[in-house]
Amino acid sequence: MRSSATCSRRKARRRPEEDEPVNAPTPKAALAAPLPQRERPAEALPGPSDWSFELIEQYHAVIRATAERFGLDTYPNQLEIISAEQMMDAYASVGMPVNYRHWSYGKEFIATEKSYKRGHMGLAYEIVINANPCISYLMEENTMAMQALVIAHAAYGHNSFFKGNYLFRMWTDASSIIDYLVYAKDYVAKCEEKHGLEAVEDILDSCHALANHGVDRYRRPSRKSLAQELADRKDREAYAQQQVNDLWRTLPRKAEKEAAAETRRFPEEPQENLLYFIEKNAPLLEPWQREIVRIVRKVAQYFYPQRQTQVMNEGWATFWHYKLLNTMYDDGWLTDGVMIEWLKSHTNVIYQPPVGHRAYSGINPYALGFAMYNDIQRICEHPTDEDRQWFPEIAGTPWLPALDQAMRNYKDESFVGQFLSPRLMREMRLFSIVDDEHEDELEVAAIHDDSGYRRVREALSRQYDLGSREPNIQVWNVNLRGDRSLTLRHFQHNGRPLHEGAHEVLKHVARLWGFGVHLESVDAAGEIRKRYQVPGPAH
């Protein structure tokens, strides 16, 4: 079965890189208002529990036409029907259709399988991959109503977000990721054959432990095609080794040059991307090991935007599956039975347990994102005086362009900081708590009232700042003339110390660096509060 969207039982495709800008497709202008329905159907689409490929195509055609009426700009779609076991396999390999082998994926698969069989967890109805074409996995155990929900949610909601949001446009190349993963899988497999499973596994273990510290947070990476990458790899390996040799050259020097070298700091400025620094400068890594470090950090970079947009991304997909399927029902395409079935699932997804409820584990990103996009539409269509005061730039304006602008230009932190309204804070009964280490009790710092709106919004916005959730650890210095040790520096956020497992993570840094590693944890005043030290591995 093929169309501009395709439906089949599995497949794969491409890859990102450095040194060449991405030719991201120009985004379409948002529609000022939804387009009218073309014609009303004589009867609704069939709504049996069991699906068929033909029926999925019929539903998909109507969903696609409805999405076009709202101006959703998406990559071409590729739908894959997979089994529950394949869905668990996709879970274990971070949702990608192809990946290199690593024991952690097998461990995750077994844990997921056991929980699923014991009834302790359900499986996602879908997994969607930011690729061009956009790949959406539909589980074959789904009913037809759930397949329709998944197509609207993943193939049009997530897909349009991947294509439109600035973080994904800046940091990822959807047309190349699948080919890159194929390349990574083949390269790691060849390394296993040549150097042994244990040697490759050791490198991957350490790289995975440091993956979140292997991304560029502020500098936009440029990219090469897969063909360019393969052609340039040998030149890059030779050049990198030459640079390492130059850095660690130990030929005798004149006394004045030695004195200057003693005061030389390397790197001249702190470096935030630890894996990049190790790839380029670790003294003892072989070329194949550097390439594996590069592979892990490239994959980590691909997932970086997703870690910053969960509320926006899931909220956007939920908003659009709700909008598209309701529109289809109003237009006469869906039966009452199909409508009730997907609405039940939708209601469960956006449920927000109250504080104190045994199911409460924080704010549900689906609930918050869905509520915020609905609230933006309300502010545009039916603004109150309060809305006009808080959101003068969008109050009373067409809602489609306002929603499109919000989706494209924000991440979770700034989205909440810009668009969370007093009305929504009241409806969700939000409040802010301060946990002061010097106090015995928690303090309610602000509630959803006139004096607390901005403080509640700022506090919630900060929760989605990666800088407040992950430790800020930077490469500080390398002892070029002595023991070749590497010094890292941790900049505390709000006086928060590192996790007690920091020493174990440093062992992975030492394995990759090849020599001893020091870590200094400093407070806001720049004073060192704690030191960690790990010796280099035995050579």
Regions found by a protein language model. Name each.
Residues 103-130, 185-239, 243:
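N-terminal accessory alpha/beta regions
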Residues 161-225, 314, 318-332, 344-355:
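Post-HExxH zinc-binding segment in Zn-dependent metallohydrolases
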Residues 151-160, 316:
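Active-site His/Glu-centered metal-binding helix of metallohydrolases
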Residues 262-361, 365-366, 370:
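Long, internal scaffold/assembly segments composed of regular secondary structure
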